[in-house]
UniProtKB/Swiss-Prot annotation:
Single Gene Ontology BP annotation: defense response to Gram-negative bacterium
Subcellular locations according to the entry: Apical cell membrane; Basolateral cell membrane; Cell projection, Cilium membrane
Residue ranges, annotated region (Flexible ZP-N/ZP-C linker): 430-453
Name the UniProt record assigns to this protein: Uromodulin
UniProt-annotated stretches for the region Internal hydrophobic patch (IHP): 454-464
Modifications the protein undergoes after translation, according to the UniProt entry: N-glycosylated. Proteolytically cleaved at a conserved C-terminal proteolytic cleavage site to generate the secreted form found in urine. This cleavage is catalyzed by HPN.
Main location: membrane
Organism: Pongo abelii (Sumatran orangutan)
Region span, Beta hairpin: 150-171
GO molecular function, one term: calcium ion binding
Amino acid sequence: MGQPPLTWMLMVVVASWFITTAATNTSEARWCSECHSNATCTEDEAVTTCTCQEGFTGDGLTCVDLDECAIPGAHNCSANSSCVNTPGSFSCVCPEGFRLSPGLGCTDVDECAEPGLSHCHALATCVNVVGNYLCVCPAGYRGDGWHCECSPGSCGPGLDCVPEGDALVCADPCQAHRTLDEYWRSTEYGEGYACDTDLRGWYRFVGQGGARLAETCVPVLRCNTAAPMWLNGTHPSSDEGIVSRKACAHWSGHCCLWDASVQVKACAGGYYVYNLTAPPECHLAYCTDPSSVEGTCEECSIDEDCKSDNGRWHCQCKQDFNITDISLLEHRLECGANDMKVSLGKCQLKSLGFDKVFMYLSDSRCSGFNDRDNRDWVSVVTPARDGPCGTVLTRNETHATYSNTLYLADEIIIRDRNIKINFACSYPLDMKVSLKTSLQPVVSALNITVGGTGMFTVRMALFQNPSYTQPYQGSSVTLSTEAFLYVGTMLDGGDLSRFALLMTNCYATPSGNATDPLKYFIIQDRCPHTRDSTIQVVENGESSQGRFSVQMFRFAGNYDLVYLHCEVYLCDTMNEKCKPTCSGTRFRSGSVIDQSRVLNLGPITRKGVQATVSRAAFSSLGLLKVWLPLLLSATLTLTFQ
């Protein structure tokens, strides 16, 4: 006889193992109480048996834990993890800096990407490495990454290395300084014995003594000191940044018998800050000009400097903003989501002789105003829409452009000069812009209020192309069953950076009733219907918009109309996982659809069919034909707590 087949040999080995295991792990007993605590008792009509549970070995009356970690092949821990035996089982433990992932073993933890795992300094950059992370101080700073501070001279233009808490950081001294409110620093104050030995760092002078260091030699025995200190040089303009100057002390007939190095910076708003050092001797103190009492230049804008004229300080336009040619007049254009704003600088207008400014758009009812947010500019605003203020809309395949003309005059009547500036804002076509620039888009709207966050408006619209830039327009949509439906949902208003729009259930019905029992699900429980290969979900739960497409269809039976419905949810990206994870065959969960969060669109008519839709059916979906963009649903409010 030849050798037995390999299959038979394996069957014999396996059977022997089972027989041995059964014989070893099971014993008969009189009562279940005789079984070990880690055994299972089985009672039938005649026999009571004790069997050791999985992970234990013995006869059932006595069961001992199996050490799976010591038996080759008894555990499935990966090579880069450690097996730890536990009673009846085992666990796989990853080294520090790694995390156990199903099917992948130990994977590196990105401490830089997960909040609370890295402990770098606030200014440092976290760099992930395998099993750990590094903290790197920014350029110009020194430290180990857990602690960073700047070094003198390492900061950028207009900044200095200043103390903040226990560290040194780069900061603008116009914001990072201390104040000196001491009336006796005025050059009009008499003698005294003040000495500025404790002054080190950035200071701003305020109060009745004056707001600026004196720029001329101060007589001795003034400013409550013996040898007054004054600034040997002029104050800088705001565009010069931080400049170095010398402060001189007057004594014994010498206006600069002693000196100290100081730094000065002009700040927006007409005040100065000084990086002062202690004087070389006592009694020496810094003196201020009484004609510069705070308030004389508080109205200076960023285009102006505070200048002294015959001992008095006032605002003057910077030299850079003085122009004589109208062609050099600059305008600032801001293209916002809902409006356009064009502004002209007051200093340039003043240098051109415009003591009074009359500015208006193509529709003269839209006129200029002094910009509250920035006193340097005079502005005019128009909505980014076709029509208001004479704004004209032009559109191509990729952009929508709104254009208008700004007119400028220096008198109510015009004879010699008629200045006009053409301006335009172009917006790339996306779902929102394309809806905004269409006359009658097929769109549905729903208002949702999220507690403590604000009012959100969610819209759903039907588009003609896969780029979602050409919405269907008019009072109805007729398509063949070969055509594709491109459906877009979008979120407006509120804090869009925090919330993602999630389509939880999107389905079709043959009637306008969203609760119709006959439903065809396109998206169900957040995921696409896997048995319909024409369904493509482009975006869901990732941003403030959602998109999907499906080939047009008809319901079996005597149905020629299709209505679309989408249940939407505002997902908090800070506290929830918003992007769905969809794989394999999915089954209906049976969850109830919240009709207060459902958007409705329709009807969509199959091409070649003359649809008859009652007035009530249109009304139930809010289908109103108006001159403004068409809205296809009533506005509802839902509060999330």
